[in-house]
Amino acid sequence: MYTGWLKSFKVGREFTPEERSAELHKACSIDAAPAQRLGLISINSTFVDWIDRRFLYRGMLNTSVFLIGAFGFIWLFLFLATSLPDNAPLFSLVYIFALFVTISPFAASFFLYALWLRREFFCHVYYPIRFNRKTRKIYVFREKRDGGLLIVPWDKVFFHIGRGTDMKFLRDIRGEILDGEIVKDTFALGHCAERDEPVKEMWEFIRRYMEEGPEAVAEHPLDKYVELSVAPTWKNCLISAVGFTNATTPFKRVLLFPFIGTFTVVRWLVFKSCKQPVFPPEVEAECQVEPNDPHIWPIPNSIGEFVTTVPGLMAYAMRKAQGIKTPPDVPGDLASQFKDWGKK
């Protein structure tokens, strides 16, 4: 989960047979229905932007622990700094020991920042991976320290189901740039999962878009909306924290409130210190969108907004989750709401 984020993917290595056997094919459909799985940021006739793997984990458990630890060490440093003995000789053992004890917490807080927090704060809110079906290119937005912007042809990337380095039960979509059997670069996209099916569903969405067009990714008119919101708002941070803690019932939410509250605040602080990702002008020039593009899907202000506000959409989503097909001739006023939102 943290490879490619806290530590870089290994490059210059030999591509393994296990990775090759887990290939996600571009030309043929797989046994999975296309699904966003909260991975789609935006879509139109020219490109889709997909979320990076780390997004849902930003500001959560590890970051909260490290941040609270850093603040605790700073507080301890200030407390000890005001407690240095005034009457001890400057180079006495007592003074040196007191100085060492005082500086240690400050050094520890700096270590926590260098180890983890610098990867969270003062970076970017998210790191989109853009798939342009007209230029047949992929644009991977990355920090300069991680190699900077990667632009690579769609047909030159080997995609497969990646596995976690430490948490081997986790899967994700992994893109490999190969030179023969040697890995030259690697990137991951979409949220990780504990099963292959969610990963395959995200891949089928991307594959259909690039190979068949935007009309192929939605099997029903009521599927044509974006589920995810990347806006760094309190509400989105709270929704993400509830999802991260798996607080699916009111009882769980009350029980886990200290964690939910902490994660919400820390995630909000992380995002407020970060800036929005902006692709270079030359990339945007290749990704022009027509003003009246019929395949621009509406984007919610908060995660899951449309399901809770559009009449009938919750029932449709529940039927879909149960595998129940819904006829495409839905009431006109219900289907048209997405069409109207897309023009706003």
Regions found by a protein language model. Give the residues of each.
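Short, mixed charged/polar active-site loops
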Residues: 128, 146-152, 182-186
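Alpha-helical transmembrane spans
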Residues: 49-125, 233-344
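Short, non-transmembrane cytosolic segments of multipass membrane proteins
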Residues: 1-39
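Juxtamembrane amphipathic/hinge helix adjacent to a transmembrane helix
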Residues: 41-45, 213-245
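Phosphoinositide-dependent membrane-docking surfaces
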Residues: 137-138, 147-166
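A membrane-cytosol interface segment of integral membrane proteins
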Residues: 158, 166-227
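Short, hydrophobic/proline-enriched secondary-structure or compact coil segments at domain edges
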Residues: 36-57, 173
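Membrane-cytosol interface motif
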Residues: 128-143
